[in-house]
Amino acid sequence: TLVRIGPFCHGEIRNGGIPDWLYGRPFLIRTNDREYLKYVDRLYAEIASQLEGFFHKDGGCIIGIQLENELQHSAAPWAIRYPDQPIDYTVADYDVQNTKFGVSVQEQDIQSPEAGNQHMKTLKEIALSHGMEVPLYTATGWGNAAIIPQEVIPVTAAYTYPTWADIGMSPFYLFRDIHTTPDYSPVRYEGYRYPSFCAEMGVGIQMTYGRRPRIPAEAGEGLMVRSLGSGANGIGYYMYHGGITPQGKRGFFSDEPSGVPKMSYDFQAPIGEFGHTRASYHSLRIIHHFVNDFGHLLAPMGVVLPEHSDTITPSNTHTLRYAVRKKENAGFVFITNFQDHCKREDLRDVSLTLKLASETVRFPQDGTVTVVKNA
């Protein structure tokens, strides 16, 4: 288990997890403001008490902790605001201009990057002071979000049907070396120094009042084949199991300004909010078996892309999309033929010739294969 301890956690929860009673207080949230840190300390103490005995050091299942979420990248709208005033966001004043709504590319320079990194470091120190000691600490890696250099693993994301962005074909079905250049770059770290670890792979998506995309099962399978072939060495979903938004004394804790349902957080996930499985559950399970059985071989392998792979566009329906993970004289070939918001076609008479260190391998050994559409 890897636990996201916040304080800001988003998840389409009211204020992204920040309580109403911090709205309008005379200090900056999500910063090292002393008054804010008093509440962080109180929160972390409560979380630590609830997790006591479940940490890996105690023989439990918790092997990792994510600190904060999308710090200096994204925020949630405050559910309360003064009449006739624009929406306020759960973010420090100096980060307002940099704040995105949802996972996306950050085009602007961060105004106070060191303040963000230092706040992340402080959060880790507070967590440790309450005994939340784990082998792995992670932080949002995409969109130039704040991290703790050399102390956390910056995790990655990919959403192919985002309801917060313009409708269009996603680049996340094109093979790239995401270990060197992570998705949603620029980022605040050098990719080659860290493992490429997926945390929010959008194999589903939450419907909103204004956007209600239906995601086919093939979308999740294609996304994960592409991500592993592009260098990912970990699998993490958002969401893998849907849920139900909890209810408080005055209503449900849903992110109402964002137009999400009050109760359902099904997310079209592989396992739905009531425990039912979708077709995506079964297709992804094959990938999970592959990683479980061959992950120790895959992890140290680098990415080899075909010549001119960087010229393939999402709308290109006739060029084979593939990549190789390779080390010395062994490797794995990853092929996909899916693209969101686009009709694909079968690719016939396909064969690959792989030049290894000491031999040349043809796939298939004889003849050709057909890569069916949406595979």
Which residues does each predicted region cover?
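Short, solvent-exposed loop/turn and secondary-structure capping segments
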Residues: G6, E12-G17, A75-I80, Q85, ...
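Short, hinge-like loop/turn segments at secondary-structure boundaries
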Residues: I18-Y23, V152-A157, F253-S254
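Carbohydrate-binding surfaces of carbohydrate-active enzymes
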Residues: R25, Y36-A48, D58-I63, L71-H73, ...
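Glycoside hydrolase catalytic-domain groove-lining segments
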Residues: A146-Y209, L223, S264-D266, I271
